[in-house]
Amino acid sequence: MLESGVEEHDVEIDEGSIAKVKAASREFLLLQKAECFLLRKVMKTRDAFDIYGLRQSGVVLNEQLENHLEDTLMADQIDAAEIAAKIAQVDEKRCSELRALLPSEVFESLAKGQFGILREALCDLYRRWL
């Protein structure tokens, strides 16, 4: 794990006892989701939804993490056409898998827009390479 991808948090374990807990940062989680979305043999729309959620909460990749993602794209020879093709796969049929994972009102809201908001979040995330 990249050192910049680790955050340390104080967690109270009982009265007067504090433990230091290390966890992946939200930025690092976004990097992992960005890689998973493109590298999985079978695309999972839950990755697209997670990317959307992280982006909606203001998470962006810093320069170091963007460069790491670029290294991954180059190593796996993923070009703009492949990225665009993966994004296009985020359609109503594939997004039906989200019905079992999301509250019905969230799913229905996404479905009304034909899941376009997920594709927009992906286009924004990968804009540097599209």
Residue ranges and their predicted role:
Residues 1-130:
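Structured mid-to-C-terminal alpha-helical surface segments
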